[in-house]
Amino acid sequence: MIDCANKYAEMDRAMARLRAAVLLMLALLACMRGGAQDLREGFLNPPADARPMMRWWWFGPAVTKPELKKELETMQGAGIGGVEIQPVYPLMLDDEAKGIKNLQYLSPEFLDDVSYANQTARSLGLRVDITLGSGWPYGGPQTTLALAAGRLKVAEVPVSGGFVTPPALAEGDRLIAAFVVAGTEKTFNAATAKRIDLHGGPVEAGAGTQTALFFIASHTRQTVKRPAAGAEGYVLDHFSYAAIDEHLTDIATPLVNAFGDKPPYSVFSDSLEVYGSDWTAELPAEFEKRRGYDLIPHLPELLAGGTAEAEAVRHDWGETLSDLIRENYLRPLTQFAEAHRSRFRSQTYGDPAVTLADEAVPQLPEGEGPQWRSFSYTRWASSASHLYDRNVTSAETWTWLHSPAFRATPLDMKAETDRMFLLGVNQIVGHGYPYSPPGAGEPGWSLYAAAVFNSHNPWFPVMPDITKYLQRVSWLLRQGKPANDIAILLPEDDAQAAFTPGHVSVTDEMRKRIAPELMGAILDAGYNVDYIDAATIDKLGTIPYPVLIIPQTDRIPLAAYKKIESYAGTGKVIALGKAPTLGPGLMEQHTSAEIAAISDRLFKESNHKGSFITSIGEVEDALHHALPPDLDTTGTTEGLGFIHRKLADSDIYFVVNTGNRTVDAKVRFRSNRPAIEVWDPDGGRVLDAGAHLDGSGVSLVLAPYESRIYVVEDHLQAGVTASGQTAVTTSDAKDEQIADLSAGWNVHFPGDAEPMALNTLGSWTELSGRKYYSGEVVYSRAVFVGHALTAGARISLDFGTGTTFEDMRPPNASGMLALLDPPVREAAIVFVNGKRAGSLWHPPYRIDVSEFVHEGNNQIEVRVYNTAINLLAGQAPRDYTALRTKYGRRFDPQDMDNLQPIPSGLFGPIHLVERKNK
């Protein structure tokens, strides 16, 4: 009996363990299903915080509360998620009849409008950010010359008769030191420098020509760009705590206080653009404290360059400037934001001397520029987000897009935005939305250097579809963690050693050192890439990537290089062209021998752990030797790009054709998960309900500028579209024509009593009296379907493919444009039998109308929208003479000379087609 009892007890325990295991497995399966279902639900109905924002320019500022409310309501209705308020220059003189009154920046009336805009936006569920200044960079009337951006000025005075006369000083200038050197002002020998009295006088005669060098603490005298009325003044000294403290007190505090108990989501610092600033009053003392020696005796070397010692001094000067902008500009702004229950959003690049590690200070890094295959401010910002665990990277998007203003199309928007997504962006800040009151006329106001995305734009009716696409992709690219494989070590210490007076930008130097060919080689090999710098490696203690590429580099801090050597035990280090051999600064030259020894151990000795390659042509093989491609592609792949996010139970691949020709490829994902789904990021549909991956790859055909989502997952899911239907695509399905609709249309212009018959498709600018028309034109016709439609077949309206063209602009042309003349110029909304079937704003110009078409007679209506350029081309150029007389020349309209109407309308051919799944 005792044995039986023990036996039954053991059986009970075994059953309990089994039940627990089953319950655990069911729970895990539920979690996996829940995770996948949550991902799909978020994709179909993304949350509001992923919607694109708009930079909202207040010109003047000449704003009124009724117009502010109207524009905010319009934005909300268009799917725009928030605004960044940026007051800028006036565009009209005060005109009571037109309701134009330019307020003074920071006046009580202006601040009351800021408060009203914030309250109204919040009531609409919109986010509100604000620039802590007007125009850019920070500065204004409160910035005295003493607090203005500084620069090191050098006056070269020939020594005549053993005597030198000091130069006259401008207001605010101060002599730092004076030296006499052998040679002329352009070719002197810094090694011969002898210090002389600041006041000049007799000098010791030397053999040959002599020159006196007077080093002067001066100012750039740069003024704020594009300021509002009352915001004019000097750009502040970004290296000086006193300067930013004054700005925070006099400018930022009143602005933020206007928000009351609803603080701005973030406060914003635009791209620095403090040109030529390389000095501040406290620099000599700060330099000696941080670098351990006196800079002043080395000023002739700093100026002359050309020696190892001079480069080391220049490095130390640059590093000190970087320290000062981090400590005296970025940190105070971050602390100010936190103290006011906000966040600091910053474009931390450009002039002056910020480094990648400085991106760790702002809570919200922001980039700019769609340079996907070359060094990019945007990849700079997203790399920092990935390194410092910031899940959201924003980007100023569409700056200079297809200039001039009003020329940009929805296709242009998508072409640039998709590159931003590939660069790691997942929050779009559109550039931008001009405040434009009725008194401004049509098509309203615009910024000199930007596209226009407000309701004065004729194609604005399709904006909700555009913003939904941006919202959907932005949200999806916030899920999980970034999965970029490759880190490029930025040679920032070499960049600082290359600084010269007036030129102290790390990011400008990176353009010379991170070649587009290197970026292209990495991307074409099937990987994605981030940047990293030595300071970040030192801070993190390791490199959170499988592969580190060291491009040609001379200098590196020893502590960081030791960590790289340690990382090489598990990660892969590839040096390209030249491995480091030097300590960075003058007081670190003693580390050079050990740095060179590490390079030898990594790349030369018999048991070396790293790889050394001599040319960019070897990059692909070196990477493939290190790890398999994340996305392996064959076929016609020019312009194909991707970005990968990794989740616990799935991998997300956002795949884009960035070019104007069709991609037709076979792709293989490195992920070893067995199942895959294909999602349409535009319509929110699951295109392929699920398939097993067998290693043979997936067929991929993308029209120009088309994008797609692949979700590689652990388990197959039921395929459900946004409308609740399963949608499956097969590669061998073919189109069968139901009807050719390339003729027989009627067109109706607003104001016409009756539509007119259109025999052939083409530009409406060729029609009588329509050359300068901008707006909506309605195309309509009937189509008879003479047979019953096949169950499960997909019926589509195909509007054609358009015509590609080459970019014939100069290489340095500003802004981006899509290199395709589409068959729909520039956007359209399609109705079938009175129901909205969808919109057309990018390739493929094709709409699934399966649920709207039926056997028998069907009515098709296409509402087509062009750009406002045609309207502008028919108007006289705007005369800003009186405006400039009052306010000065604060802007110049870009590319507005000799405007010509742009082809508009439907071009076809148009077909109604049926695709039967086989």
Regions found by a protein language model. Give the residues of each.
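Extended acidic/polar, glycine-enriched regions
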Residues: 177-180, 184-256, 691-738, 855-857
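An acidic-aromatic loop/edge-strand motif
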Residues: 136-146, 150-153, 158-165, 169-192, ...
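Bacterial N-terminal signal peptides that target proteins for export
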Residues: 4-22
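Bacterial N-terminal signal peptides
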Residues: 21-30
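Acidic/aromatic-lined carbohydrate-recognition and catalytic surfaces
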Residues: 88-198, 205-207, 214-225, 229-236
